Structures are given as C-alpha cells and as structure tokens.
Regions:
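Conserved phosphate-binding elements of NTP-dependent enzyme cores
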Residues: 1-953
Length: 953
C-alpha cells in the first residue's frame, strides 16, 4: 500500500490543503493553537478512517455506533482503519479505576478466583473444607428450642426464567423454594423475568433443636441431602433472625466456625453484589454529614450557627431552639457564645449525641439527644420531595468507607491471598512494584507459593497477560500509579498514556493511530520512554500521527507537517511538510523557535511589555523578589506526600515542578485548592490531609483557569462568555430603527423568541436525522445561517446588522467599536492575548483548549483587580505552540503585576525560567516522590544537585 494522500481538505479553517503522510511512519502535525492541527488530524483523517470502517458494517450494527460526519475533503486515499487516542479524562464514573481501564482487574479476578487461598477475615487462618459430620456437630451446639431452616442454593444471581430448574426441584420431591428472598410452595412460584438476575434456594427441612437421637438422625439426613442438592453448600437460617450460617464442603474456618462461598472471579468484583462491600456498595467511599458544612461559620453564636436548623420551617425552628436551650442549661453554656469558643468535648457531644447524659422529650417518650448530625440525617430522610432532599446534600462530604477502608470489597474477598498478598495489597502497589511481584511469582509458577497445595501452573497464561499489561504501563512512564487509583483523579495526559498502553497491548497491525499531545504531563525525563513506545507502535506496521509541540518528539519523527501561518482565519495552510532537517531551514514560525531565531524567554519579566526575545538580543531575566507575605501549607500527607511544608510567596509567579507522579496535583489541586475553596466558598470537596494553612487572610479570591470549553453548545461564543454581547445588544436597542419598532435588547438575542429565526431556533443550522447514517447539519434556508429573522436584521448600527457584527473577527470589532470605551476595553484584552482572529459569534465548540484558556484569561484581565487573587493553572501550555507559550507568559505576568499570585503546575522549561519561585517535588514518582526537593528562585533550583528539574534548567 502507498502513502496516505489527503487532497482538498476544508474542515473548519483548513484552506483546501493537500497533505501526504508516509505509511508506517511516525508523523508529527504541529503549528499554532487554532491553526488547524486537530481539524486535519482528528476531524479529517481520523473521522474519515472511522467513518469508512463503520460504513462497511451492516445497517443493524451501525445504529449502535457513534457515526462521524463525512469531512469536507475532496479525496483521501490509502487510509487504514483509524483509532484516536485523545487527551481527555475518563469522565466522572466513580467505579472506574486504573485496573479496570487497562483490563488488568479482569485478569486479577481470574487469578484470585482460580488459585487464591481463602483466609478467615476474623482470625486470619486458612479456610478449610467442612464435612457433613462437622456441620452436624456445629448445628447440635445451637441452644435447645432454636427454630432453624436448612436451605440448599441451586441458582445464585443468574438471569433467566429457570423453569427447568424448578421442574427438577419438584421431581426431587421438594415442596417449597425461596426465590429472591421470598418463600413459595412450588406450585405458586411467580413467572420470573428472564432479563433479571435471580437466586433460588430449596427449602430442605425446618427443624427445632433438641437433644434426642431422632433429631440427630433427621438433622444428619437433611444436611447430607442439602449438600447434595446445593452442590456442597447449604445455608442455615435461624428463625429468630440471627445472621444466616453458610456451610460448605469446600470452605470453612475451623476455629471461628465461619463458612464461605466457593471462590469465583465475581467474588473479587466490586461491581458485583458477590464481591462488593455491603456498606458502600463497591464505591469505596460514603457520604456523611460534615460538621464543617453543618456549621459553616464557627464565629456565629450557638443559637444561630447550626445552618440546617435555621433553614427549617417555623415550628421546627421553635422545636430546635427549645433543644438548644435545654442543652445550654444542662451544660452551663451560653447561647451567645461563638461556636468556635465552646469546649471541644461539648462540641463533639452536640454533633454526635449525648448518650444517656441528656434526655429530651421526643414525641411520646423521652430519649437521649442523638446529636445535630443525626437530626439533619432524619430531616433528609423525612424530606417530602427530591428538591428538599438535594438541599440536605449540601451538608454532606464523602470519606473512605469505614467498613472496607476504601478497598471496595467485602471482608471475605479481602482475606484471599496469592503468594501471600491479597488483591487489595496488590492493587495498592505502584505499577513498578506490582510488576516486580508478578514477575517473581511467574518465575516460580509451578511452586506452591502459599504452601497449601495450590500451584500457579493453571494460571500461567493469566500471569503472562498481567505482566505484559503492567509492563506497558511501566514503559509509558506511569510506573508511579497504583492500580486502585480512581480514573477521575488522573490528568488527561495520564489517561491518554493508559489508553496508549492498552493499544500497544492489543498488538494490532496496519492501523492508523492518531494521538493528541501524548507528552502532556510528562517531565522532560520521561519523554524518551514515550517516544520509544510510539516507535514500537510504528515498527509493528502501523501509521502513527501525533499532534504535538514538543521539540524532542519532532526531532525523532519521520515526517513533520507544519500548519500556519497564523491561527483561526489566518491559519489552515500547510507551511511545510517533510523531514526534520528540512524544517530547520524552512521559513515558518515553528522553525524560527526550533533553530533559535526566536525564543520564548522574555526580555523583561517585570514589565508587561513582553516581547519575544531574539537570539542576538539576549538579555538577562529580571525576576520579582518575594515579599514578606507567604501562603504556607504544612504537614501535607495526602497520597504520596511525605509530611511536607511548602511556601508560596504572595504577589509572585510560582511554578510547581517535578516528574510525573511526584505529588504536584495532590499538593496544589487536592490539598491547597480544596482547602481554600472550603474556607472562601464553603465548597463540599474534602481537601487532602494536612496540618495547617497560614496566610489565607491575604487572599480574597481563588480562580482556576483550565482548558475546558467555555461552553458545550453551538450557542456559546466568545461574545457571550466575555460578556460584551449584552453591551452590543444594548447599543442596537438604542438605535432609531429599534426605538421606532419598539425593540428592546432581548430582540437581538438568538436565545429567546422574538428576534431569532424560529425555523432553526437561532442556531443558523438545522439538523437532519438520517436513519443508519450520521446526522447531517444544513444551513437554515429561512435565515441563510444568520440566526435572526428579517425584521431584526433590518435594524443597523453603524451600517451593520447584528448578524454582520457577530461575523466580525475580534480585531475587526475592536476597530469598529473603538469609540465605545466599555466595549473597546473588553475587545482589547482579547486582541492582547492573541485572539484577534477568532469570530465574535464563533461557536465555543470549535475553539481549541488553548484558545478557550486564553479567553478565560482575557476575561480575568478585563475585570477590576483587587490584587489579592490567587490564580491556579494546571499545565497551561498544553496544546500551545512556542509562540502561544510566549503570549501566555505575557498574560500571566500581567496578572502578577496587579499584585495577584499566580501558581502554575508545569513541565515546560521556558515557563520555569520565567518563574519568580519554583517548588520542586520528587525526586521520583509514586513512593519515590512526595518530598520537597527544593524551593526558591530558578537559580537556587539550578544549583540543587538532587533536583532533576534543575538539570534541565
């Protein structure tokens, strides 16, 4: 097969481009943010590869698959089936963890279900089989007169109608069964839903415990019959209501008398009722009423501080006031005393209950007061509507489940070992440690590692698969992750590398892989491993296309496609395509930075007059020295943080660095940000463990600026997000034409009826639903894509209709509204951040992550600064070209000049050079990280021998 040839691509801003991508090569697509890289790689190449593959399937199969729109391209030849590995997080599924995403969990369940050695959760001794005689002996110890029933399980959690099973039970002479917990005579069993899981137990015998020989004979016969019917398993239920006893010919503890089900892979699944912790349902965490949320303002007096009590109905408030008055009298505290000044022991009793110390009237009887948290829980349970219940959820936080300690599994599953390790212990290990563990037992698979007569020979293929998948995770630089880590806590870059490891594990050949910036989140140290993996993917006979800005990745690529010259309407052209050597000689913006003609490092870091530095005009960087005020967080121990204390100088530009997994996000995002959000905004998310936080009084706002979209619908656009669309509508409403017709500002909105085109609902396009084909969007024939009706478009401001103004670029609008100071100021901030090329009415869904981030920064710059704001950014250079990074640095330093504090998690060496203060965590990832290697200005980091970051600086 020949190369992949693209001719006449016009998706989004692509200008009828022709591109050649050599087959079985590693190709890098680069260019400015918004120049059309994703439009070419994902919306053209991947979309067409995926579409052609899906079209080859039957119409029946196609209806179940997401179908991609046909890209606007004249011809693509030589295309292979395409797989996109995008840089996105996993979504919010709380059950998704690293082990489930990589499918390692399935193999672990198979391993532990096949050769695991069960131990008693109470005493820890290995579980042994029980004979019928041992079971009878145990039951004979029941007190005389105890009524009990012997059940034999025949169906356990299986879907189906089970009609044949019920017929077989009747043939065997039994008359009663228990189906899904309810007991029926066999003739009266209701028809079972074949789509639902059911459990069926045969009622073998009903007995009353006595000491005569007839009872012993009957009990022995019933136990033997039950074991035969239930496949070696019986359940004995005490009619008095005690917990049922499970007896097994296969698994039982000789000392505690506890019996266990036979081990199966589902016993280790937290998504199955047979393996999940009964307390948290397999989630690993539970919601609880949090004292800090119930009493958000601890400076208020006792009579006013309990927030949910103050928001109850009039009668309830009177009742709770009476409770507080009695408590105050008995414990001799004043209702006017601020909550924070009450004794700690009293506060604990007030929240959690007074036991028998304090008895209060409660309906018809006197009861001890169970505490404020219990009363709020009851208020929630008794709420008459979902809306009322949701209000009480605001007082809840979540914490690890106290029953399973966050492991998600039931006690019996947590006590099963292979080679001395439980599945919980294996899942809690970093990937590199679990890889070493499984390689160790793989080497002695024929042995009996537990000394209990179980060899690992039957599962050597399972072990091989586990080792292979762990090896791929290790190779993509994720050796620090634990298998039980929640997917929602992973960054987009980590998630992408997990998907990459899964793809390499699949061993496919002849596939087109399209990746979106796989180096995101990687310290320069880890890049080499990733590049080696992409080469391995290529060498197997696949074509790998990578959207990337990393110079090292470009240097090792076989082919480079450079788009430009600008972004948005000014981009979309191929500036260069060919090998690395040719790019260095090309006249493109990318080449200017790669060969040193331009540099990101600024001339003056203290000034907002931030120009790109020429190589022959290199000047030293002048940093802003830290002042006397610091934000100091002490004793951080969440995840792998080793009890560290970190100082952030206020009013400076601080960069947090360290290799992947060193604890950067844990420190800044999970600990510092969450605690500040709780203190300033009463947010619910619990912060990571730390001892103290000082200096918060010097901060009045915390703003996180990420690369998430500014809106997820076609109606969202820069004009509505930054907030000047309402100003434009006001201007139109003041024109003579609008006044004569009685139009207000609402007439010029495409979100409300009146001025918008009702045929398309103000979208400008109409969706045509095609059975078995992807939906097609066509320009609205009524308004011609202009969104407004004819009457609204007749009103002009400065000779332009509202639709014509929304079609302008930001730069054009800035010139047009130059004499409207309020509007011009907001538009100028967008021009200053390098977004003069985007359209005012451009759909938010077409903006890149870098563009969305710069719009958010422009919005912040357009607001009046208090000089006490803390800005948090996690890897803001994601998706940014060298030139975009220079613009971003100018913006961040502008925020700093207003007296604000900017904290950035970043691996980009040029960003580190511009920092006033660097906090370097490490020295490694996972267990080898979590230490403060050094902190201080860049010079101090350079001189620190232990710092990997210092070497790259």
């Amino acid at each position: 097969m020949g190369d992949i040839i693209i001719e006449g691509a016009k998706v989004h801003n692509l200008r009828d481009v022709d591109v050649r991508i050599p087959r079985n090569s590693l190709t890098v697509v680069t260019g400015l943010s918004g120049s059309g890289k994703s439009s070419l790689a994902f919306d053209t190449l991947y979309a067409e590869g995926q579409r052609r593959y899906v079209e080859s399937l039957s119409a029946y199969a196609r209806q179940f698959l997401d179908q991609m729109q046909k890209p606007d391209v004249e011809r693509i030849e030589g295309l292979s089936p395409a797989i996109a590995i995008e840089q996105r997080t996993s979504g919010g599924n709380p059950r998704s963890i690293v082990a489930t995403v990589t499918e390692i969990h399935d193999y672990l369940r198979l391993l532990y279900g096949s050769v695991g050695v069960a131990h008693c959760p109470k005493c820890g001794k290995p579980v042994r089989r029980q004979s019928a005689e041992q079971i009878v002996e145990t039951l004979l110890k029941l007190p005389a007169g105890t009524k009990f029933i012997i059940y034999a399980p025949v169906v356990k959690g299986r879907k189906g109608r089970h009609e044949e099973t019920l017929v077989d039970i009747k043939r065997a002479g039994f008359v009663r069964v228990r189906v899904d917990g309810a007991t029926y005579p066999l003739e009266d069993v209701p028809a079972l839903d074949k789509k639902k899981s059911h459990s069926i137990d045969v009622v073998v015998d009903r007995l009353v415990s006595t000491s005569n020989s007839q009872f012993v004979t009957r009990l022995t016969d019933s136990v033997e019959l039950g074991l035969k019917t239930g496949g070696g398993l019986i359940t004995v239920e005490n009619v008095g209501g005690d917990a049922p006893l499970v007896f097994s010919e296969k698994n039982a503890c000789p000392d505690c008398g506890l019996s266990f089900d036979e081990l199966k892979p589902r016993s280790f699944s937290f998504n199955s009722p047979f393996g999940a912790c009964p307390e948290c349902g397999g989630l690993g965490s539970i919601y609880y009423f949090d004292e800090d949320l119930v009493v958000p303002d601890k400076t208020l007096p006792l009579r006013e501080c309990i927030h949910p009590w103050r928001r109850a109905g009039h009668m309830a408030i009177m009742y709770y006031n009476e409770i507080l008055a009695r408590i105050a009298r008995q414990y001799k505290v004043k209702l006017e005393t601020p909550y924070e000044k009450l004794p700690a022991s009293f506060r604990h009793k007030l929240m959690h209950g007074f036991d028998d110390d304090l008895v209060l009237p409660w309906r018809k009887e006197d009861k001890p007061f169970a505490g404020v948290l219990d009363s709020v829980k009851r208020m929630m349970e008794n709420a008459e509507s979902d809306e009322r219940r949701e209000k009480f959820e605001a007082y809840q936080s979540y914490r690890p489940c106290p029953a399973c300690h966050g492991s998600r599994l039931r006690p019996e599953s947590r006590a099963v070992t292979v080679a001395g390790k439980t599945i919980v212990e294996v899942m809690a290990m970093p990937v590199k440690d679990s890889l070493a563990f499984f390689k160790g037992i793989q080497a002695r698979a024929v042995d009996d590692p537990d000394g209990l007569g179980k060899t690992l020979e039957p599962v050597k293929d399972v072990l091989k698969e586990i080792v292979k998948r762990l090896g791929f995770l290790n190779d993509v630089g994720l050796d620090y992750l634990t298998l039980d880590r929640s997917s929602s806590s992973l960054s987009g870059g980590e998630m992408q590398r997990i998907r990459l490891a899964s793809q390499i594990g699949s061993g496919l050949v002849g596939v087109l892989y399209v990746l979106d910036e796989p180096t995101i989140g990687l310290h320069p140290r880890d890049n080499e491993k990733l590049i080696a993996m992409l080469r391995e993917l290529r060498d197997r006979g696949n074509t790998v296309v990578v959207v990337e800005h990393d110079a090292e990745m470009m240097r090792t690529a076989d082919w480079i496609v450079d788009l430009g010259p600008g972004a948005g309407r000014e981009g979309g052209r191929v500036m260069y395509q060919g090998p690395w050597d040719g790019l260095l000689k090309a006249e493109t913006l990318t080449a200017d930075y790669l060969n040193g003609r331009k540099k990101i490092v600024p001339e003056k870091v203290q000034s907002s007059e931030f120009k790109v530095q020429s190589a022959d005009n290199a000047q030293g960087i002048r940093h802003k020295a830290p002042g006397a005020k610091f934000l100091t967080i002490s004793g951080c121990t969440e995840h792998n943080l080793k009890n560290i204390t970190v100082r952030i100088p206020l009013g400076t530009f601080t960069v947090v660095t360290g290799v992947s997994g060193s604890g950067k996000s844990t420190l800044i995002d999970e600990t510092l940000k969450r605690e500040l959000m709780r203190r300033l905004y009463h947010a619910k998310a619990a912060p990571g463990k730390f001892r103290s936080l000082k200096g918060v009084e010097n901060i009045d706002k915390v703003i996180e600026i990420d690369q998430s979209p500014i809106g997820r619908t076609p109606r969202s656009n820069p004009a509505t997000y930054v907030g000047f669309f309402s100003d434009i509508r006001e201007l139109f409403a003041k024109t003579e034409g609008a006044k004569a017709r009685g139009y207000g500002p609402g007439r010029f909105s495409f979100n409300v009826k009146g001025g918008r085109c009702e045929t398309c609902g103000g979208d400008g396009v109409r969706k045509l639903e095609m059975s078995f084909l992807p939906d097609v969007y066509v320009t609205c024939e009524q308004c011609g894509g202009r969104r407004f009706n004819k009457e609204t478009l007749e009103v002009k401001y400065g000779g332009k209709s509202i639709a014509e103004i929304l079609d302008m670029t930001v730069a054009e609008a800035y010139d047009f509204f130059a004499k409207v100071p309020r509007l011009a100021a907001k538009l100028k901030t967008l021009v200053d951040v390098g977004l003069g090329y985007i359209g005012l009415g451009q759909s938010a869904t077409t903006l890149s992550g870098g563009e969305a981030q710069r719009i958010k920064l422009a919005t912040e710059l357009s607001r009046r600064s208090t000089g006490r704001t803390l800005y948090l950014l996690d890897e803001p250079t994601t998706g940014l070209h060298f030139d975009d990074v220079a613009k971003l640095m100018r913006l961040l330093l502008k925020l700093r000049e207003g007296g604000n504090t900017v904290v950035v998690i970043e691996h980009n060496v040029d960003v580190m050079k511009c920092a006033d203060w660097i906090i370097d965590l490490g020295p490694g990832g996972g267990d080898a990280g979590g230490n403060l290697v050094c902190e201080g200005p860049p010079d101090a980091i350079r001189k620190c021998k232990e710092s990997l970051t210092g070497r790259f600086l």
